[in-house]
């Protein structure tokens, strides 16, 4: 399997400054629709949480929209949401068995590129403990592709990127799958305003910045724009 992160390592500066830009919630007002209409329903459906759907939705939205973990990788978010749901007295009172996924816990600890490609490879290689995680993740991707259309960028994004390009190399730094990023940026004709799109398959946001910008630009010339603590 080719390493998608090689594009980041090979990236060569063309300007004095570097600007990393998060996509969901920063360029596009897409966090709410993705998590409320795609992620949360698939969280309930594929982890058998129908009996506590109200509380499952609450914890999913808390983890991914309304707390310090906003914008985190979906696999970390899944573990955190299940942990919080397990602690909810409403779930305990209904004797609902909130699933645990030891294989997922082990995988997120050792895998640096938590994405579709590495998950597919794990399952294909015989990691049956991740099979249900793949079913859920694939369902989320299908829901996003089906539902999330016509979500424009925030006002003045194109103008801002155009101005930034005069002095800086601009790059998407995101934990969204690359396929979705490519589609959304192309749909809104913004893909020509950035040097590269880095998604979850290329590693964490910190790893993106280390490979693409660290030691290639002066530290004071590197800027990351985001909407969550994880973008810091």
Q: What feature does the model see in each segment?
A:
Residues 4-60, 76:
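Active-site neighborhood of HAD-like aspartate-dependent phosphohydrolases
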Residues 41, 49-51, 62-105, 214:
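Active-site phosphate-binding/coordination module
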Residues 1-21, 58, 67, 87-88, ...:
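Non-catalytic pre-domain segments flanking phosphatase-related domains
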Residues 120-134, 141-172, 207:
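Short, acidic loop-to-helix structural element flanking the phosphoryl-transfer center
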Residues 135-150, 189-201:
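Glycine-rich phosphate-binding "P-loop"
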Residues 206-232:
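Conserved Lys-Pro-Asp/Glu-containing loop-to-beta segment of HAD-superfamily phosphomonoesterases
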Residues 39, 139, 157-185, 197-200:
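Substrate-recognition element of Asp-dependent hydrolases with the DxDx(T/V) motif
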Residues 86-140:
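Extended, charge-rich helix/loop segments that form flexible
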């Amino acid at each position: 399997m080719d390493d998608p992160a090689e594009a980041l390592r090979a990236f060569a500066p063309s300007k004095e400054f570097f600007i990393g830009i998060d996509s969901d919630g920063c360029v596009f007002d897409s966090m709410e629709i993705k998590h409320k209409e795609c992620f949360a329903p698939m969280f309930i459906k594929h982890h058998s949480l129908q009996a506590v759907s109200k509380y499952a939705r609450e914890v999913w939205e808390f983890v991914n929209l309304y707390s310090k973990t906003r914008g985190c990788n979906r696999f970390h978010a899944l573990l955190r949401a299940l942990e919080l749901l397990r602690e909810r007295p409403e779930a305990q009172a209904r004797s609902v068995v909130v699933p645990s996924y030891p294989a997922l816990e082990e995988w997120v600890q050792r895998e640096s590129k938590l994405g579709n490609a590495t998950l597919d490879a794990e399952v294909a290689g015989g990691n049956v403990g991740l099979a249900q995680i793949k079913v859920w993740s694939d369902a989320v991707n299908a829901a996003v592709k089906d539902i999330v259309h016509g979500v424009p960028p925030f006002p003045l994004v194109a103008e801002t990127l155009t101005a930034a390009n005069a002095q800086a190399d601009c790059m998407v730094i995101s934990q969204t799958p690359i396929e979705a990023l490519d589609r959304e940026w192309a749909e809104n004709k913004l893909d020509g305003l950035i040097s590269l799109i880095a998604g979850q398959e290329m590693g964490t946001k910190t790893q993106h910045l280390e490979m693409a910008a660290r030691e290639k630009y002066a530290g004071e010339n590197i800027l990351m724009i985001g909407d969550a603590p994880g973008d810091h």
